[in-house]
Amino acid sequence: MYVILDKDSRVKTKILNAIVEDPEIVLLLKEKYVDEEIWKFCIERDPTLFHKMKHPSESICMFACSVDGSNLKHIKNKFKHILITDVMCFTAVKSNPKAILYVPKAMLNEDLKEMAFDGDPSLMAFFDTVRPEYVARLLVEKPYAVRYVTNLNEDIICEAIKESPSICPYLNHMTPRMLEVLHQYHPAFYNLYKNNDDAINE
């Protein structure tokens, strides 16, 4: 049995065959031959193509954020006809934690920031405030994250030391109180630092 394709179907088939080999070909095609499914196909294979679009729909923008959250930057800076929503921000940050840097200030909240920090603790360095209780929990799970906390204080560090001494090698300085907590909760570990009151890492 033979299926006779109309002209548009044949053209679309040729387009699909071409973009499988090179998704960037989509930029050379007339808009009437490129529907949303073709754009999604291309963006999925090469997320950088998204910012080269002229007039993406909200659906395409949401899809682009799900493929690579950093595409939120292009929606914010270039495609200003698109309304950025809470769902779009969540989708972007879930896909790529660095997307938190492009979330509009009015839509930033602690839950969204902490989801980003869970994926990439270094992002804390871009924010002046992070919830102390979150920092305390994160430092137990990822001691190296102490490098990126901007609002760090002695109380938080002491609580982290109580839970695990593994944070100590990442501290530039240990106060007498920190050493005391280390001695009380992890005496074996304390022996490594008891004669170094000024700094663990110079």
Residue ranges with predicted function:
Residues 1-202:
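Alpha-helical scaffold segments
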